[in-house]
């Protein structure tokens, strides 16, 4: 069920010759638009920081808005975790941060940069109670990114994500740690209390006792799933009215740290 895309195809059509840099990337990645020894514009009263361009935002900055977050793989400028956007330098604070202070509200630990509370990489609020239901007001839509972070319990048996429409399940994502002594990921859809044909994935990036990050990107005709920053699989929509998918159920043998959604 894994598609044949490279990560560079995970989000097509960026048109960005250097689709790198992710402000607020997880791990120890730097934020966008930083400068050596200086904070973002505004840190030096009455002057721009070294290398700034008078009267405009420096390369890699997004004037007047928060930069986009991203599913792993190139997309809009500054989207992919890794090297920073043009003009950025390692180890510098993100927009709104000052030397010696943490990033803006919503920054994930050890990450520079931050997003509003609605962003996918907010400060973990957990552990959250499992099973956990994440409301999806207005349903899902293309370019919505759902991010789930937590830790697999020791001797885990399963993880379950269910994108629900009432009693139906539009997308069932079910890593199984021991199905007949094998590890497998099962995806399916349930309509009118009937499960459809299973799609099985042998690649299995989860480990008992280890932390994980699952990202689900909604596209017009499929879901894309990435685990720990690597594209894993895609699942074609069997329910076409995405706006009716109003809840994500999270269950299984995990400690849940955070669950968020945002548009990218």
Curated annotation (Swiss-Prot):
* Record bears the keyword Aminoacyl-tRNA synthetase: no
Q: Where is the composition biased (Low complexity)?
A: 37-46, 76-105
Q: Where is this region: Disordered?
A: 1-105
* Gene Ontology terms: cellular component: cell surface; collagen-containing extracellular matrix; cornified envelope; cytoplasm; external side of plasma membrane; extracellular matrix; extracellular region; extracellular space
Residues binding a beta-D-galactoside are 195-201
- Ranges of Pro residues composition bias in the record: 47-75
A Pfam family the protein falls into: Gal-bind_lectin
Query: Chief subcellular site?
Result: cytoplasm
Specify the superkingdom.
Eukaryota
Which GO molecular function annotations are given, in alphabetical order? Answer: carbohydrate binding; IgE binding
Sorted keywords for this record are: Acetylation, Cytoplasm, Differentiation, Disulfide bond, IgE-binding protein, Immunity, Innate immunity, Lectin, mRNA processing, mRNA splicing, Nucleus, Phosphoprotein, Repeat, Secreted, Spliceosome
GO terms of biological process kind: cell differentiation; extracellular matrix organization; innate immune response; mRNA processing; negative regulation of endocytosis; negative regulation of immunological synapse formation; negative regulation of T cell activation via T cell receptor contact with antigen bound to MHC molecule on antigen presenting cell; negative regulation of T cell receptor signaling pathway
Task: Write out the ranges of the repeats annotated as sequence.
Answer: 35-43, 44-52, 53-61, 62-70, 71-79, 80-88, 89-97, 98-107, 108-114
Query: Motif Nuclear export signal, which positions?
Result: 240-255
Query: Do you know which CDD domains this protein is assigned to?
Result: GLECT
Identify the stretch(es) annotated as 9 X 9 AA tandem repeats of Y-P-G-X(3)-P-[GS]-A: 35-114
Q: Let me know which tissues express this protein, per UniProt.
A: The highest levels are found in activated macrophages.
PTM Phosphoserine: list the residues: 6, 202
Q: Where in the cell is it found?
A: Cytoplasm; Nucleus; Secreted
Ranges for domain Galectin: 132-262
PTM N-acetylalanine: list the residues. 2
Question: What does the subunit comment say?
Answer: Probably forms homo- or heterodimers. Interacts with DMBT1. Interacts with CD6 and ALCAM. Forms a complex with the ITGA3, ITGB1 and CSPG4. Interacts with LGALS3BP, LYPD3, ZFTRAF1 and UACA. Interacts with TRIM16; this interaction mediates autophagy of damage endomembranes. Interacts with and inhibits by binding NCR3/NKp30.
> What job does the chain carry out?
Galactose-specific lectin which binds IgE. May mediate with the alpha-3, beta-1 integrin the stimulation by CSPG4 of endothelial cells migration. Together with DMBT1, required for terminal differentiation of columnar epithelial cells during early embryogenesis. In the nucleus: acts as a pre-mRNA splicing factor. Involved in acute inflammatory responses including neutrophil activation and adhesion, chemoattraction of monocytes macrophages, opsonization of apoptotic neutrophils, and activation of mast cells.
* Protein name as catalogued: Galectin-3
The upper taxonomy is: Eukaryota, Metazoa, Chordata, Craniata, Vertebrata
């Amino acid at each position: 069920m894994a598609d044949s895309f490279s990560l560079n195809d995970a989000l097509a059509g960026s048109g960005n010759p250097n689709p790198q840099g992710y402000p607020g990337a997880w791990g120890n990645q730097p934020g966008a638009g930083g400068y050596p020894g200086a904070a973002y514009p505004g840190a030096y009263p009455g002057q721009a920081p070294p290398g700034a361009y008078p009267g405009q935002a420096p390369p890699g900055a997004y004037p007047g808005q928060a930069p986009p977050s991203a599913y792993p793989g190139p997309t809009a400028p500054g989207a992919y975790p890794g090297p920073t956007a043009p003009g950025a330098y390692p180890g510098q604070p993100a927009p709104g941060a000052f030397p010696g202070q943490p990033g803006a509200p919503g920054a994930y630990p050890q990450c520079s940069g931050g997003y509003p509370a609605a962003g996918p990489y907010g400060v973990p609020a957990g552990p959250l109670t499992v099973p956990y239901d994440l409301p999806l007001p207005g349903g899902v839509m293309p370019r919505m990114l759902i991010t789930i972070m937590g830790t697999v319990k020791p001797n885990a048996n399963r993880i379950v994500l269910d994108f629900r429409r009432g009693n139906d399940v539009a997308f069932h994502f079910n890593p199984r740690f021991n199905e007949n002594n094998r590890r497998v990921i099962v995806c399916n859809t349930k309509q009118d209390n009937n499960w459809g044909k299973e799609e099985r994935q042998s690649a299995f990036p989860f480990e008992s006792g280890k932390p994980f990050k699952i990202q689900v990107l909604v596209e017009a005709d499929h879901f894309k799933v990435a685990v720990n920053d690597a594209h894993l699989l895609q699942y074609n929509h069997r329910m076409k009215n995405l706006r009716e998918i109003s809840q994500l159920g999270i269950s299984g043998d995990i400690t849940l740290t955070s669950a968020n959604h945002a548009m990218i």
